[in-house]
Amino acid sequence: MFHCIPLWRCNRHVESIDKRHCSLLSVPEEIYRYSRSLEELLLDANQLRELPKPFFQLVKLRKLGLSDNEIQRLPPEIANFMQLVELDLSRNEIPEIPESISFCKALQVADFSGNPLTRLPESFPELQNLTCLSVNDISLQALPENIGNLFNLASLELRENLLTYLPESLTHLQRLEELDLGNNELYNLPETIGALFSLKDLWLDGNQLAEIPQEIGNMKNLLCLDVSENKLERLPEEISGLTSLTDLLVSQNLLEVLPDGIGNLKKLSVLKVDQNKLVHLTEAIGDCESLTELVLTENQLL
């Protein structure tokens, strides 16, 4: 059970307030008493519908949690939060992010997942301190062409959107370690995707991919590659270059053979190739000396 303690019982110099799961219909007025000291405000899982003007006087905020509410608008005054480092607005009813978000220069972690957004503001790539960005399940149709300006990004989650292509600048994200593009409408990948040398986890499941560019073999640090539920008829021989790979998931595709180069994946421990059209298995798979899980069900193996 959650107990929401009245703030007037607390010290006037308050740096953190946690009012999660308190059935709040509006932002408590007493919070504004601490505008000179408040750095962390957690109002997640309430029933908030709007953020009033006094809310944006909390200019010392460094962490703001507003997930799982019913907020219908993010006002341009969000620009006041110039010291904000973490922002969670996931699972609300916000239809757009104002261009003024670009003034939140200190922002490092942002989650806008589960809102009825169709686009990110053009100014968004100006948030160059961002390291983690989550925009899952928001009906996103395209990324800003200059998304590559977010050069400090380490994690980018774009799952369950309506993306049909990736801008070339995406491959400028040289510090990116996690990229989740699962359940979109991607038909192809840019050849330059192989330039994401720091990438460790790449999820491309549930798209419309018919092929993977051979340049993917340049991702020497990749640990997990998920391309299941696509329309792949072959894997490039260059996949042999993924020498750090531990998990390769290619279930539910149209593969008839696996490339011989798969035998070079000495660290591969999980290989899932179920629900394809395999008619035989390359002997090279015997060279995958770390393999502990091999799934081949629902193929046409003789």
Feature names for model-found ranges:
Residues 1-302:
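The feature captures the LRR N-terminal capping module
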